[in-house]
Amino acid sequence: MNAPAEPLVRYHVDRAVATLTLDSPRNRNALSAALVAELEQGLADAAKDPSVRAVVLTHTGNTFCAGADLSEATDGDPTANPRRLVAAMRAIVELPKPVVARVDGHVRAGGLGLVGACDLAVAGPKGTFAFTEVRLGLAPAAISLALLPRLDPRGAARWYLTGSVFDSAEAQRIGLLTEAADDTAAALEPLLEALRLASPQGLAETKRLVTADVLRTFSRDGESMVAQSALLFGSDEAREGMRAFLERRPPTWAE
């Protein structure tokens, strides 16, 4: 008899805080169908547990999330991956409890969408960030639903268009993070203590206020961003970009 598969997202509750830990280091916590399903289940469990006041989203290993699982990118329905990502981000935004990202590693592409969907976000000195889509023949379409309502426009343009890596201090400056910290545990604790003092109703209704613009963006642009992502993933340039990435070589257009 086969042993049950190890969870890709671990769920733990302590002192009114549910911690969801992305735990698939073999593929850098890439957004596979299985990982996203477990993430959404964890969020649903936290939503229905009256003892949970807030959720922390964190990771094992040196990568918070590498973005899409490229091994699944061309299987079946081309809209499946972006639709899955949009659903996961929206589940975070719509959860009637604050979600706090705790990052101390690399965040790429779709992983930035998860951070952007969170209400608060803290990253440590090992945090690095990059919108790598532009170097793969893609665009950060789906993740923009959660990110563009929150980011400084000039900062978004710089990092979206260059695909370059930036650190936690810059991520805080452009509005991706609440705090860039030397010690994420120390930075997180006063935030969580404050959330524990707040009423469940107060948190839910206040979160509804501060996420209203983000949710309007999801409702207005969600389907078009899914369609754009699917179209780009199926393009010749994106196929070359992803092939080059997997083969660890420059794409044909790189100068």
Language-model features: where?
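Conserved CoA-thioester-binding segment of acyl-CoA-metabolizing enzymes
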Residues: 1-60, 189
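Terminal peptide-recognition signature
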Residues: 20, 24, 39, 57, ...
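Glycine- (often His-adjacent) and acidic-residue-rich active-site loop
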Residues: 51, 59-91, 107, 217
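Short helix- or helix-capping micro-motifs
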Residues: 66-68, 155-164
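Active-site-proximal glycine-rich helix-loop-beta segment
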Residues: 110-121, 125-126, 143-144, 168-170, ...
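C-terminal long alpha-helix characteristic of the crotonase
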Residues: 122-127, 177-223, 230-231, 236, ...
